[in-house]
């Protein structure tokens, strides 16, 4: 989808002369659309950002940012309060920007309000999983693929969703496909089997279920940066919604040391050195070194944003957020009502189709019975014709016998006996004819009755077809969801302008703190641990895939994940473990890595 917008505004005149300012063409790519704008040379990053969110109807702006490729080829987030032209955007026409999630929620089910927000997160996370930016084990990949199919195609329909239907859909990481000796048809069948489990699930609900599973993956929502400690050991710093984590160079799945945001009171950097001051003033500063000053700037900005959202989640919702949630509830209720109408319409249609099929089967049976009755009637009529012919022959013989009676006086007694026998035979024949005529009449009556029944059934079939047409119309009406317009709002982020370039300069930021905040990791459990059905699904998938697994194709992450599972670790158990002990002990542990 391409949306073109013109944000040019009329410039004032000075001394009677119109001052024409230079305009720039920009293209902003979201996860499912391309937006094109013409902006002024004075347009700031925030003005461009506001134009984008207004165009797509997004109000949960605090999660998102505009990303661009700078002159050095690195991905950089646009600075909101600096002119677009003055930022190090790669010189192209149009200028290229990507609208992406910059910060992730702690819990998607609790925080994501708008459907557009849900969709953007879903598409971004799905893309990260498919490209292996986020590691996802094979069994989870297949289950997520089934939710992705539900989100895209709706309910499985065995009539239209036949073999090969998913051939053009990108559903699994290439790594997972390469690691298993399965054909495309076998992968498709596996995904379609689980897809059928999601029947009647709304597309938005399928996206939410996808994200609820994905957020338990170890690499979900983590921004990684290469750093070194004082000893010069190469490590990874992970910044996410829950805090800061330290990883060894060859393992980005399993953090070794963790610091929740609630323990940090100040962050700063000087040149390549980054300093984190804990709330515990007895603890030493947590210090590391980045390869370039610009990396420290990005770390600082991400720390500030994530910490801001971390604290905001633990405060009462603002009026704007309360209104958004109320509106979202209304929309969800309306959608639920539409869903119920749709289900009723579907059920009515199924009943009508079933009844029509029953009528058609019954009509076919009646027609077969009628054909049999017609054959019986023809046979009876032929028998009557033969019996009548025999009766005529018998009467002719009797007449001839009476004419010769005088000549046969000597044989009178014998002839009389013969005559009596013929009379009995005649009566018997007449009785047989009458019985057959009665049988024919009975069959004819049955045929007439069947004919009436057939006409009645035909009327019922027509009525069933009419009801089916009404049900189809109701189904079409029920499947048309009302659209709501969302008014974009201005959102002022606290990301201040930092020093330009890679030059020196000390930058320090105090963070809002609250010593009474409980670490959310303490009670956090993965969805698979809380949901027995999901746990069983993943277990069954893992067993199925094990039969075709090619262990020679395992990656380093596969081996790390398998070892973590063997030791009973998951994302939240690991985070709880690495946050144990006081801050000083963890800082010392980092210095000794």
From Swiss-Prot:
Sequence positions bearing Phosphothreonine: 574
Keywords for this protein: Actin-binding, Cell junction, Cell membrane, Cell projection, Cytoplasm, Cytoskeleton, Membrane, Phosphoprotein
A cellular component term, taken from the record's GO annotations: adherens junction
One annotated GO molecular function: actin binding
Compositionally biased intervals (Acidic residues): 490-499
Annotated InterPro entries: Band_41_domain, ERM, ERM_C_dom, ERM_FERM_C, ERM_helical, Ez/rad/moesin-like, FERM/acyl-CoA-bd_prot_sf, FERM_2
Gene3D superfamilies linked to this entry: 1.20.5.450, 1.20.80.10, 6.10.360.10, Phosphatidylinositol 3-kinase Catalytic Subunit, Chain A, domain 1, Pleckstrin-homology domain (PH domain)/Phosphotyrosine-binding domain (PTB)
Assembly and interaction partners: Interacts with Mer and arm at the adherens junction. Interacts with cytoskeletal actin at apical buds of microvilli in the precellularised embryo.
Function: Involved in connections of major cytoskeletal structures to the plasma membrane.
Protein's UniProt name: Moesin/ezrin/radixin homolog 1
Species whose genome carries this gene: Drosophila pseudoobscura pseudoobscura (Fruit fly)
Higher taxonomy: Eukaryota, Metazoa, Ecdysozoa, Arthropoda, Hexapoda
């Amino acid at each position: 989808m391409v949306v073109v917008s013109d944000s040019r505004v009329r410039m004032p005149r000075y001394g009677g002369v119109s001052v024409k300012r230079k305009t720039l063409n920009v293209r902003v790519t979201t996860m499912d659309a391309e937006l094109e704008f013409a902006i002024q040379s004075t347009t700031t990053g925030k003005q461009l950002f506001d134009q984008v969110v207004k165009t797509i109807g997004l109000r949960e702006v605090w999660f998102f940012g505009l990303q661009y490729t700078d002159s050095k080829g690195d991905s950089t987030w646009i600075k909101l309060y600096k002119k677009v032209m003055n930022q190090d955007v790669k010189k192209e026409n149009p200028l290229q920007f990507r609208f992406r999630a910059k910060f992730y929620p702690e819990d998607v089910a609790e925080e994501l309000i708008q459907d557009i927000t849900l969709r953007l997160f879903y598409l971004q996370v799905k893309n990260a999983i498919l490209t292996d930016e986020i590691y996802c084990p094979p069994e989870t990949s297949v289950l997520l693929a089934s939710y992705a199919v539900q989100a895209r195609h709706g309910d499985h329909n065995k009539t239209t969703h036949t073999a090969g239907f998913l051939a053009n859909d990108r559903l699994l990481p290439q790594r997972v496909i390469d690691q298993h000796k399965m054909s495309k048809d076998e992968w498709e069948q596996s995904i379609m089997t689980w897809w059928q489990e999601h029947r009647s699930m709304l597309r938005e609900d399928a996206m939410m279920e996808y994200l609820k599973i994905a957020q338990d993956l170890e690499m979900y929502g983590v921004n990684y940066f290469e750093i070194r400690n004082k000893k010069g050991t190469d490590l990874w710093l992970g910044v996410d919604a829950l805090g800061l984590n330290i990883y060894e160079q060859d393992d980005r799945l399993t953090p070794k040391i963790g610091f929740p945001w609630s323990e940090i009171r100040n962050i700063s950097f000087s040149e390549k050195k980054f300093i984190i001051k804990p709330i515990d003033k007895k603890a030493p500063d947590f210090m590391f070194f980045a390869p370039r000053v610009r990396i420290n700037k990005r770390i600082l900005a991400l720390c500030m944003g994530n910490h801001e959202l971390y604290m905001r989640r633990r405060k009462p919702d603002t009026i704007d957020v309360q209104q958004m949630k109320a509106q979202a509830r209304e929309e969800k209720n309306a959608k639920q009502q539409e869903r119920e109408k749709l289900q009723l319409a579907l059920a009515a249609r199924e009943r009508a189709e079933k009844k029509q099929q029953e009528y058609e089967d019954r009509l076919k049976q009646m027609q077969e019975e009628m054909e049999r009755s017609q054959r019986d009637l023809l046979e009876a009529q032929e028998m009557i014709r033969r019996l009548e012919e025999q009766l005529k022959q018998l009467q002719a013989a009797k007449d001839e016998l009476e004419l010769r009676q005088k000549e046969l006086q000597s044989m009178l007694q014998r002839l009389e006996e013969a005559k009596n026998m013929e009379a009995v035979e005649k009566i018997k024949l007449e009785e047989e004819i009458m019985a057959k005529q009665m049988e024919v009449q009975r069959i004819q009556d049955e045929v007439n009755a069947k004919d009436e029944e057939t006409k009645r059934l035909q009327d019922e079939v027509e009525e069933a077809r009419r009801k089916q047409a009404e049900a189809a119309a109701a189904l079409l009406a029920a499947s048309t969801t009302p659209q709501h317009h969302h008014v974009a709002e201005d959102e002022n982020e606290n990301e201040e302008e930092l020093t330009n370039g890679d030059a020196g300069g000390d930058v320090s930021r105090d963070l809002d703190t609250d010593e009474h905040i409980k670490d959310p990791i303490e009670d956090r459990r993965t969805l698979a641990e809380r949901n027995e059905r999901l746990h069983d699904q993943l277990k069954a998938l893992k067993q199925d895939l094990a039969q075709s697994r090619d262990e020679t194709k395992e990656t380093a992450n596969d081996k790390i994940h398998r070892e973590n599972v063997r030791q009973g670790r998951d994302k939240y158990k690991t985070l709880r473990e690495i946050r144990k002990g006081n801050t000083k002990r963890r800082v010392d542990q980092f210095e000794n890595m």
